[in-house]
Curated annotation (Swiss-Prot):
Main localization of the protein described in the UniProt heading: secreted
PANTHER family per the UniProt record, alphabetical: HYDROXYSTEROID (11-BETA) DEHYDROGENASE 1-LIKE B-RELATED, HYDROXYSTEROID 11-BETA-DEHYDROGENASE 1-LIKE PROTEIN
Subcellular location(s) of the protein: Secreted
Residues annotated to bind substrate: S168
Parts forming coiled coils: none
Protein name listed in UniProt: Hydroxysteroid 11-beta-dehydrogenase 1-like protein
Source species, domain of life: Eukaryota
Length: 286
């Protein structure tokens, strides 16, 4: 019995490695595609915009900071984007979400990719009972994603397009210091996985790609974790390329970096050992 289990584990790991390492992404397939990227002024969202720009896509970029968006726009045009339009918006506002989709459709004449990347500010600390912040974070990290996807879905259906959702390892395997953030990502996982079922049952051509990311070296992430974590962070540009590639390939899920997939796969096999291992990667001084 033990031999069979080990054999199947080996087969699964080999198959996963082959799946991860395959490289079938052709950037030319994204030329002239119409793309809306949220949270595009910095971090992974900024890098995602640059990868689409290199492929010659038409972009609508949205975030709260206009000056930062203008800088990203200039760089996108240098890299080869066909057009770049900006929408300054705060995703905590219900009206702003509808405005973003409406302006994107007006500027682009339709939509092929909706990339949901924005997040609300989240302190990296132990749970302190701040329910109000959690409520606000769910509004920005979860409900705004639903609002945007719902508004864009009829137009993505017309184009047989894709929804790309930036998620996190915390949506699969909870980690310390991220209680409210993890709750919002778990909610995203549940909603969009269920929506994928429903679209398939309705023969709707829209694909949904959930991007499960580990620790990425964005400025905001590095500032928050400081001396609280021992694991290495991975490049935002590489993570962004993996996101764009997975979306173009209409993958159900994408995991980056590579070890996130097996970590999620084995999460329920040895939960106590998993938790022990995770907790040893974090520092806590009471």
């Amino acid at each position: 019995m033990g031999i069979h289990i080990k054999r199947w584990c080996f087969i699964i790991l080999v198959a996963s490695a082959a799946y991860i390492l395959r490289d079938s992404f052709d950037p030319e397939t994204l030329a002239n595609t119409r793309v809306l990227v949220t949270g595009a002024s910095t971090g992974i969202g900024e890098e995602i915009a640059y990868h689409y720009a290199r492929a010659g896509a038409k972009l609508v970029l949205t975030a709260r900071r206009e000056h930062a968006l203008q800088e990203v726009k200039s760089r996108c045009l240098e890299l080869g984007a066909k057009n770049v339009f900006l929408v300054v918006a705060d995703m905590a506002s219900h009206n702003a979400r509808e405005q973003v989709v409406a302006e994107a459709l007006s500027a682009l004449g339709g939509l092929d990719y909706l990339v949901l990347n924005h997040i609300g500010w989240t302190p990296f600390k132990m749970w302190d009972g701040d329910v109000n912040h959690t409520r606000w974070l769910m509004e920005v990290n979860f409900l705004s994603y639903i609002h945007l996807a719902t508004a864009a879905l009829p137009y993505l259906t017309q184009s047989k397009g894709s929804i790309i959702v930036l998620s996190s390892l915390t949506a699969k395997t909870p980690i310390p210091y991220t209680t409210s953030y993890a709750a919002s990502k778990f909610a995203l996982e549940g909603f969009f996985s269920s929506l994928r079922h429903e679209l398939t049952m309705q023969n709707n051509p829209v694909s949904i790609t959930l991007c499960i990311l580990g620790l990425i070296d964005t400025q905001s992430a590095m500032e928050k974790i400081k001396d609280k974590i021992t694991m290495s962070a991975y490049p935002a540009s590489d993570a962004a390329l993996a996101v764009v590639s997975a979306g173009a390939g209409r993958q159900r899920e994408m995991y980056y970096p590579w070890f996130v997939r097996p970590l999620c796969f084995f999460r329920d096999w040895f939960p106590q050992h998993r938790d022990w291992f995770i907790q040893r990667m974090y520092h806590y001084n009471s």
